[in-house]
Amino acid sequence: MNATTAPLPYSAARLHELAHVLIANIRELAHAGWTPATSSNFSHRLDEQHAAITVSGRDKGRLVEEDIMVVDFDGLAVGRPLRPSAETLLHTQLYRRFPEICCVLHTHSPVQTIASRLYAGSDVIRLEGYELLKAFEGNTTHETAVEVPVFANTQDMQVLAAQVDALLDKQSVWGYLIEGHGLYAWGRNMAEARRHLEAFEFLLQCELELLKLRGTRQVVPVPHS
């Protein structure tokens, strides 16, 4: 049997199904303005060895099924000789490390990008006291804090992936920022990953708005009657 007739090492039917799930969700995020100029990348676990991921350089608001490709967990293209995102390793490292993780979303909204620049020197953004912290899996109260790591940007994905792995060795997180770049968020399925992504977006926007208010006037606590 030659290479042209060799069976695919993954389910084509499952890929077809996941491609439509990815495209529908990515289009919504693109229409929200979170994927400008063909940026951002998105993936979904296909099986125990493969992931479906967006092809590099495609307009995320106009994706079709051919814009979703397959990679193995080393980030190598499988099935079709297409070029995956340069950041594919940041997706596949999560699938290798956490068998329960099935979806990884990476976006470039203005809020995410500005927050990543503003807090770059702090290495982390601490979100505390918000009711919406309960949107993150495992949180059941607002009386807690969630830390969002901020990594320095680099074009060397091996270096960045190693930094992310070192962080995950020490703590559990549902996402992180890359300086001047954007946000990564993930979950056990698309719905959970979207919830985490949207919660990060909302909470980061709240933090930015608070900074603006504190810069223009002193916030005076209202006494309880």
From Swiss-Prot:
From which residue to which does the signal peptide run? none
Which superkingdom, per the lineage?
Answer: Bacteria
A Pfam family (short name) is Aldolase_II
Q: What are its GO biological-process terms?
A: L-methionine salvage from methylthioadenosine; monosaccharide metabolic process
Keywords, in A-Z order: Amino-acid biosynthesis, Lyase, Metal-binding, Methionine biosynthesis, Zinc
E.C. designation(s): 4.2.1.109
Q: Which cellular component, as a GO term, is one annotated location? A: cytoplasm
Q: Which GO terms describe its molecular function?
A: methylthioribulose 1-phosphate dehydratase activity; zinc ion binding
Cofactor(s) recorded for this entry are: Zn(2+)
- Sites binding Zn(2+) sit at H106, H108
* Record field: catalytic activity: 5-(methylsulfanyl)-D-ribulose 1-phosphate = 5-methylsulfanyl-2,3-dioxopentyl phosphate + H2O
Query: What is written in the cofactor note of this entry?
Result: Binds 1 zinc ion per subunit.
Database matches in SUPFAM superfamilies: AraD/HMP-PK domain-like
Q: In which pathway does it act?
A: Amino-acid biosynthesis; L-methionine biosynthesis via salvage pathway; L-methionine from S-methyl-5-thio-alpha-D-ribose 1-phosphate: step 2/6
Q: Listed disulfide bonds for this chain?
A: none
In the record, the note on similarity to other proteins reads: Belongs to the aldolase class II family. MtnB subfamily.
Give the matching HAMAP family.
Answer: Salvage_MtnB
Q: What does this protein do?
A: Catalyzes the dehydration of methylthioribulose-1-phosphate (MTRu-1-P) into 2,3-diketo-5-methylthiopentyl-1-phosphate (DK-MTP-1-P).
> What NCBIfam families does this protein's entry cite?
PRK09220.1, salvage_mtnB
Protein name in the entry = Methylthioribulose-1-phosphate dehydratase
* Organism of origin: Xanthomonas oryzae pv. oryzae (strain KACC10331 / KXO85)
Q: Gene for this protein?
A: mtnB
